Swiss-Prot record:
Pathway(s) served: Amino-acid biosynthesis; L-histidine biosynthesis; L-histidine from 5-phospho-alpha-D-ribose 1-diphosphate: step 7/9
Family matches, as InterPro entries: Aminotransferase_I/II_large, HisP_aminotrans, PyrdxlP-dep_Trfase, PyrdxlP-dep_Trfase_major, PyrdxlP-dep_Trfase_small
Molecular function terms from GO: histidinol-phosphate transaminase activity; pyridoxal phosphate binding
Stated name of the protein: Histidinol-phosphate aminotransferase 1, chloroplastic
NCBIfam families: hisC
Keyword Transferase: yes
Keyword Signal: no
């Protein structure tokens, strides 16, 4: 790939973006110059409506994106309020694994006192990376901050994958991996999880050997079932010739130590984290990742320079300043998760799975339709998650909320039996 510099001379100068040396060569007259005006004479692949001689706008879109299915996001309070005809405070939102307690009070104070919102943010998020280094015990040079972990997932794919190269996905899991692979023109090899949602490590090894995929995306605790990846399984996969991206969005609720520090030992490991769950900052979009130094250099080059907003960095710094609040909220959500699990076990048409996260996956049994259950609960003002995928069409996922949220959910469920 290169840069074509068109000036006043009848030739193109091509500057390679892969070298610091300027390289140029003359091309075979793809245009003519008349009175210092340049007219392109090369053919175009753009589609034309011949009846009107108008180029159609979608003809400029990359072909593989024309078939892309849109990601199905969760709706915020203001949209749900309009759709359901209920005030936001009358909606129990248990569909997106959000932290219902919100961020520490220091966050609101810091946002209200922002000094320089009119100045571009620090491209390197230096203050936040230093704070994360203290929080994690990993030096800041291994840490990169993004506009949510979702941005980092896409950035990793853009830096690692050429179009047509493959990733391994282990469904059921976070659907953003398959979505971003499609956006980046990559192939996806699905290695389904075992019935207990553990990884099929032997099958992963076979696929790595036969298909030569570039990277594998793993979530621990896994979304949507809340299972964790054992250390033995992770070590076996790290021995394979594949880049391992470990998504620890929910690690705080698991009681398991983060593997962020492992990136100093394993050149093929990336660990992703987020402020959305732990600190209640889902709406401000702040995530971060730990990378081997041999990899992070290239992500620094390729990322958008001002990707983390001033508000996002200010809020994240303020959240980290009150570690006790973060721990207390985490403990409250874990307690409520365990209480919710016990109550859901008593519902005759639900089979809940044990979880190490802030949500519980439930199989909908006894002939009840999972999608209809989700829709009926929504009419009552209670939002839970249902999936359209083949693996999960008979399941719903319920986030752990405040005790009063659980109480409302259980009262609604009792109306079905």
């Amino acid at each position: 790939m290169g840069v074509i510099n068109v000036q006043g001379s009848p030739s193109f100068s091509i500057h390679s973006s892969e070298s610091n040396l300027r390289k140029s060569r003359a091309l075979k007259k793809p245009f003519c110059s008349i009175r210092n005006r340049v007219y392109c004479a090369q053919s175009s692949s753009a589609a034309v409506d011949e009846s009107k001689n108008i180029t159609m706008g979608d003809s400029f879109i990359r072909p593989h994106l024309r078939q892309l299915a849109a990601y199905q996001p969760i709706l915020p309070f203001e949209v749900l309020s309009a759709q359901l005809g209920r005030k936001p405070e009358d909606i129990v939102k248990l569909d997106a694994n959000e932290n219902p307690y919100g961020p520490p009070p220091e966050v609101f104070e810091a946002l209200g006192n922002m000094k320089f919102p009119y100045v571009y943010p620090d491209p390197q998020s230096r203050r936040l990376r230093d704070a994360l280094a203290q929080d994690s015990g990993l030096e800041s040079e291994y840490i990169l901050v993004g506009c949510g972990a979702d941005e980092l997932i896409d950035l990793i794919m853009r830096c690692v994958l050429d179009p047509g190269e493959k990733i391994i996905d282990c469904p059921p899991t976070f659907s953003m991996y398959v979505f971003d692979a499609a956006v980046n023109g990559a192939g996806v090899i699905k290695v389904p999880r075992n019935p207990d949602f553990s990884l099929n490590v032997d099958r992963i090894a076979e696929v790595v050997e036969l298909e030569k995929p570039k990277c594998i995306f793993l979530t621990s605790p896994n979304n949507p079932d809340g299972s964790i990846i054992s250390e033995d399984d992770l070590l076996k996969i790290l021995e394979m010739p594949i880049l391992v991206v470990l998504d620890e969005a929910y690690i705080e609720f698991s009681g398991v130590e983060s593997r962020m520090k492992w990136v100093k030992k394993y050149e093929n490991l990336i660990v992703l984290r987020t402020f959305s769950k732990r600190a209640g900052l889902a709406g401000l979009r702040v995530g971060y990742g730990a990378f081997p130094l041999s990899i992070i250099e290239y992500l620094w080059r390729a990322k958008q320079p001002y990707n983390v907003s001033v508000a996002g960095e200010v809020a994240a710094l303020a959240a980290l300043s009150n570690g006790k609040y973060l721990e207390d909220v985490r403990d409250a959500l874990v307690r409520e998760r365990e209480r919710l699990f016990g109550l859901l076990k008593e519902v005759p048409f639900l089979n809940p799975y044990p979880s190490y996260s802030n949500f519980i996956l439930c199989e909908v049994t006894s002939g009840m339709d999972a999608k209809k259950l989700k829709e009926d609960l929504a009419k009552m003002g209670v939002m839970v998650r249902h999936y359209n995928s083949q693996e999960l069409k008979g399941y719903v996922r319920v986030s752990a909320g405040k005790p009063e949220h659980t109480d409302v959910l259980m009262e609604c469920l009792k109306q079905f039996y």
